[in-house]
Amino acid sequence: MMASHGKAGPGSFGLEANLENAIRNVLNITEFYPPQAEGIENGLTGGNLMLSIPTASGKSAVAYVCMLQKILNNKGSKGIYVVPLKALAKEKFVEISALSEELNLKSSLAVGDRGSEVGSLQDWDILVCTSERLDSLIRSKQDFLDTVGCLVIDEFHLIDDHGRGPTLEIIISRARHENPNCQIIALSATVGNANKVAEWLDAKLVTSEWRPVELRSGTFSDLILKIHRVDSKNPVQLPNPRSVTGNPNHGLRALISDTLEENGQALVFVNSRASAQKEARELSKHLIRESNKEGRASADKISLWNEVSTKLVGADENTSMGKALSECVAGGVGFHHAGLSPRQRDIVEEAFKEGV
């Protein structure tokens, strides 16, 4: 077990040698963040664990390590990784299937969409699924949970959600009743009632405000950007408010242009599919105009936009939605909503991750 001080890498926890290698090779982790190390140390005891730490602090890696170690240590034991959204399930499946391949384990994806499901539901070591799909599987097969040694619930704070909460509660209650030996690992953003929820789960609570990157929260009005709060692992003085160049009647365009000039990226949230497409279309036109100005966008950047744009009107995506998305992406802006095809979503998400 890890010492209570000092740095902790994959070799600090007494893991199976092939799992240590998989962590390094697949997850590219040579040293865990402090809250990750504490979570792994507690999770490897086999008891229930609730990990409540900020976004991007590496919660999933903790669950992967604990779940895989349990499967490797207990022959015939299975693991289930539950997420709220199909897109998130596919993202986690890519990571888990890569880890599984290193460990000679079988992984499957179940999201309720036959065209998107991967692997066999009859022969798996690790299943990645949405909460609704797992609820359906449990109801249709009485002994489905009998061999599950570890159940991971990602985005656990959604148990308070009126739509998804009841399904999550039923899944957890059935798992605890039908298979008391099943370890439950709940991954959550920081929440106010973490102690009470952990008590309900009979789980060890690991919570932290530590985050690997600085998070700034602020407001933007009348072309003035004001930072009100900075969350960082080190004390930071609030920066002075600053003005952003642009048209005060088009504040969003000004803020996006300012962000891109700093080599940053932006996510803009709106309340409907139509609004997402409209804003993307207008921002794309604006950025194309801006890119024609000297120094605003490199030829390499424009080439990357065009490359992604071309993918979106390929043989399989030559639809009105594909064309609309392609036109927006040619200006460096995409839109993302439930009306996109799986391939369109994949292309847009991958382009954003790569900083295109």
Where are these regions (language model features)?
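Short basic/glycine-enriched coil/helix segment immediately N-terminal to the Walker B
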Residues: 119-123, 138-151, 328, 345, ...
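Conserved interdomain linker/interface between the two RecA-like ATPase lobes of SF2 helicase motors
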Residues: 173, 181-282, 334
